[in-house]
Amino acid sequence: MKLINIGFGNIVSANRLVAIVSPESAPIKRIIQEARERGMLVDATYGRRTRAVIITDSDHIILSAVQPETVAHRLNTKEAEDVEVDDEEEIDE
């Protein structure tokens, strides 16, 4: 199970991520408002400015104070590390 740090010690499962987007556009703002009304919004910004909106496969919306590029980089870095670990395990066998 891959976990991604989304800032301030908050971690989400990488397997559940559908999209990581910027909160600037009107459609994303609408998605955030609808999630708030449905009780499906998780605010992980600790009162700071929202810089990334994470959409999960369970229709939860997670707000993060970390840039979308940073979250994506952490996701890609974690995947690369997992591949390297898998390769090393196969060599040991």
Swiss-Prot record:
Transmembrane segments: none
Biased composition (Acidic residues): 81-93
Coiled coil spans: none
InterPro entries found in the cross-reference section: RemA-like
Segments for region (Disordered): 74-93
Highest taxon listed in the record's lineage: Bacteria
Family according to the record: Belongs to the RemA family.
Protein name, as recorded: Putative regulatory protein Cthe_1316
Species, as recorded: Acetivibrio thermocellus (strain ATCC 27405 / DSM 1237 / JCM 9322 / NBRC 103400 / NCIMB 10682 / NRRL B-4536 / VPI 7372) (Clostridium thermocellum)
